[in-house]
């Protein structure tokens, strides 16, 4: 009988995203999650930011991802991948990998860095169009999704700055009643931001969260 066993694993969660073909990683980025995918249960934001190339974990997670990709069967055409790892000090533990684009604003973040849309590239590669027009940016990128809280949404004032690259917010949400986040991708507001390095990105994420919390008004039950 086939069995699957799960165990609790210590560590912070990182993800590696990119494109793979013929045992070669064509393009990739390494990011660290800000909070985790269960954050919606406490109505706290979820996001991630790209780590610096000089960060030793960047190479270590690249090597770990390539090792996984070359051990599993993959199609002949280019595929996107989204891999996740636990990192506990020097210990790296493989969590999972999928031949798909990661959620949240991972695709937007990757495109801002490389000029490559992972979703479109995946579709094109399946019909024989395998051309990558890579234009690497000096910007580091991050994203943050803010789930709804409990109550009727009365008003939202969105943050604006030169480093805010994109904001997703549905204006028709005003007046709607919420009971908090429902799942990991619950997002009332989502920001795509850019910065100079991972510390800069972390500070900007914290700034947006604090500012948005004061500028999103609910009428409690």
Name each model feature, range by range.
Residues 18, 70-108, 135, 145-149, ...:
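Conserved metal-phosphate-binding beta-hairpin within the catalytic cores
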Residues 65, 69-73, 209-212, 216:
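Structural signal for hydrophobic packing residues in well-ordered secondary-structure cores
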Residues 2-4, 132-133:
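A short linear hydrophobic-aromatic micro-motif
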Residues 7-13, 17-69, 76, 98-126, ...:
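ATP-dependent carboxylate/phosphate-activation module, predominantly the ATP-grasp catalytic core
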Residues 6-11, 86-89, 136-138:
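A short beta-turn/loop motif at secondary-structure boundaries
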